[in-house]
Amino acid sequence: MPREYIFSDCAVNINVNEEILKDITVSASEMANKLLGFSKIALLSFSTLESGDGESVKMIRNVYNTLKSDGFDLYGPIQGDAAINKEIAQRKGIHYDDRINVMIFPSLDAGNIAYKLCQSLGKFRSIGPFLQGFKKPVCDLSRGATTEDIISSSVLTIASI
């Protein structure tokens, strides 16, 4: 069974701070709700819950606390393996029912690297990137986009209106 994920941010924000990460998370959640019917968010980190510390972990914890109090269905900080695998998440102290479908990366570097590795090594089909936060949907296609990529991106851009 195919699994769909929203990865964010993979293309735009070079210097992420707490406010930008919060906006990225909200926009990605809105896109997931429109395209996938639900949004369950992982705020990704090298740390799960309290297992590590540092500036990026502190930023993720603050975004988590703000958005959790606003009613978002999210988990974080959480490592990638725990975001994908419920059994690993449980061993690390995180419990979720449905699968997580929105992956929020702590930096453009992490997001872009993960997106390209999934596409190349994991044979994931990637569509986009979609630029969020604009009045109208915007898709930024790679110079290596195929005809199928262009058609799929166009269909999803229209669906997100």
Give the ranges of each region predicted by the language model.
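Anion-binding alpha/beta catalytic cores of soluble intermediary-metabolism enzymes, centered on
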Residues: 1-161
